Design a protein with these regions (language model features):
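A residue-level marker of the well-folded mature domains of exported/periplasmic proteins
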Residues: 42-53, 57-382
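Secretory targeting signatures
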Residues: 1-69
Length: 382
C-alpha cells in the first residue's frame, strides 16, 4: 500500500514537472506581457511603429491647429501722434477697429505714441508677441520705421494708412482724393455767388495737386462758367498763420469758396473763411463742425479701409501690396452725403445743416457718374 502511494505521488510530481515545462515553451510570453514583436516580423513591426508615430504627429498638429483657430483673434493699432480725440485719422481708425470688433468679434489693442521716435518701438513690441493677425499703423510718418520692422518680422501682417512702403507683408492703403475732391468742387461750383472759387494746398506735390485737379474738374463740370483760381501753397504742413494769409488774399480777390488740403496749415485757411463769411471745405475727415461757414469736407473713409484689411486677415486672404480706394470702394466721399451722415454725427456729436436740394442732387449725380465710369476724374499724378 505504501509502495503504491509512493508510486502515485511520484507520478503526480513527474506530471507536474512535465506540464510546467510544456507550459513554459508553449506560452513563453505570458510572463512578461507579450509585445507586438512576438507576433510579427521585425520589418512589419518597424512599419507599424512608423505609421503609429506619424499618426501621433498628425494628431498633435491637428490639436495645435484647433487651438490656433479657437484662440481669440486680435489686431494691434498704433495711432498717429496726437492720440484719440483728434477728430481725425486716429478717431476714425479706432472706429474701424471697433466696427471689426462689433461685427467680426476681433478684439484689438492700441497705443497712443507721443512722438514719431516711438513708432519703431511700438511696432516691434507688437510684432514680437506673435499675437496679432494684423498690426495697423496710422499716418504717413510711420513709413520709415515700418520698413525696418516689417523686414524683421516677415511673417507678420501689417497695414499702413496713407503712405506706401514696399515690404511684401505690408498693405499700403491710399485714397483717390481726386474723386472725393470732385464732389467738393461740384458743391462749390453750384453754390458760388461770385463765380470764383479758390484752393489752398500744403505743398506743391502730386499728392496735393491730386486734390486740386479733382476740385477744379468738379466745379467746372457743375458750372462751366466758374473761375477756379490758380492753387496757392503754404509750403508747410503746420503753419496756420501762412495758411490764413493765403486764404485771405484769395478771398480779397473775389473767391467766395475756399477748399484747403494743407494739414494744420489748412486750419488757418478755414479760419480766414470763417472770419470773412465765405464758404469753406475741409479735408480728410468731416471738419464741418469747426465753423458754420463749412458746407462740406472731402472724406477719407479710413474706418472702411481698416475694417476691410481686418476682415481679409481674419479669413486668411490678407495680401501685402498697394491698395488704392475711391468712391467705388467707399474709401472716399463727402460728408454731406446721406450715407456718411451717421458716422460723422456719432464721431463729432453734431448734425449738419442739409445742403440745398438741387446741390445735393448734383453731388449725387456726380458720385453716380464716377461710379458708372461716365465721369473720369483727372489726377495730379499725370
Amino acid at each position: 500500500m505504501a509502495q503504491t502511494s509512493t508510486t502515485l505521488i511520484a507520478g503526480i510530481m513527474i506530471a507536474l514537472v512535465i506540464g510546467a515545462a510544456i507550459g513554459w515553451f508553449v506560452y513563453p510570453a505570458m510572463n512578461p506581457t507579450p509585445s507586438l514583436e512576438d507576433y510579427v516580423s521585425k520589418a512589419s513591426y518597424n512599419q507599424l511603429k512608423a505609421e503609429s508615430d506619424a499618426a501621433k504627429a498628425q494628431l498633435a498638429t491637428a490639436q495645435a491647429e484647433i487651438e490656433e483657430l479657437t484662440k481669440p483673434k486680435k489686431v494691434g493699432l498704433i495711432l498717429a501722434t496726437g492720440g484719440l480725440g483728434d477728430k481725425s485719422f486716429n478717431d476714425i481708425s479706432f472706429a474701424g477697429c471697433q466696427m471689426a470688433k462689433d461685427k467680426l468679434g476681433v478684439d484689438f489693442d492700441y497705443v497712443e505714441p507721443n512722438a514719431i521716435a516711438e513708432y519703431e518701438g511700438f511696432q516691434r513690441d507688437f510684432a514680437m508677441t506673435g499675437d496679432y493677425i494684423l498690426i495697423i499703423c496710422i499716418a504717413f510718418d510711420q513709413a520709415e520705421a515700418l520698413s525696418i520692422v516689417a523686414a524683421e518680422y516677415p511673417e507678420q501682417n501689417f497695414a499702413l494708412v496713407d503712405m506706401v512702403v514696399n515690404n511684401t507683408n505690408v498693405a499700403s492703403l491710399t485714397f483717390r482724393a481726386n474723386e472725393g475732391s470732385f464732389l467738393v468742387g461740384v458743391t462749390a461750383g453750384m453754390m458760388t455767388e461770385t463765380g470764383k472759387v479758390g484752393f489752398v494746398g500744403g505743398m506743391d506735390i502730386p499728392l496735393i495737386r491730386d486734390f486740386f485737379e479733382g476740385y477744379e474738374a468738379g466745379a467746372k463740370w457743375a458750372n462751366p462758367n466758374v473761375v477756379v483760381s490758380a492753387p496757392v501753397f503754404v509750403g508747410a504742413w503746420a503753419d496756420p498763420t501762412k495758411g490764413k494769409e493765403l486764404a485771405t488774399t484769395l478771398i480779397e480777390q473775389g473767391n467766395d469758396a475756399i477748399y484747403s488740403a494743407a494739414g494744420k496749415s489748412g486750419l488757418g485757411a478755414l479760419e480766414a473763411a470763417h472770419e470773412e463769411g465765405v464758404m469753406a471745405f475741409g479735408v480728410d475727415l468731416c471738419q464741418d463742425y469747426l465753423y458754420p461757414e463749412m458746407v462740406g469736407s472731402m472724406t477719407k473713409r479710413v474706418d472702411e479701409a481698416v475694417y476691410e484689411m481686418i476682415l481679409d486677415a481674419l479669413v486668411g486672404k490678407f495680401k501685402g501690396g498697394f491698395y488704392s480706394g475711391g468712391i467705388k470702394e467707399k474709401w472716399v466721399g463727402m460728408c454731406r452725403l446721406p450715407e456718411e451722415e451717421p458716422l460723422w454725427e456719432e464721431l463729432f456729436k453734431f448734425k449738419h445743416q442739409p445742403l440745398p436740394a438741387d446741390v445735393l442732387n448734383k453731388v449725387k449725380e456726380a458720385r453716380d457718374g464716377i461710379l458708372s465710369g461716365e465721369i473720369t476724374v483727372p489726377t495730379g499724378y499725370d
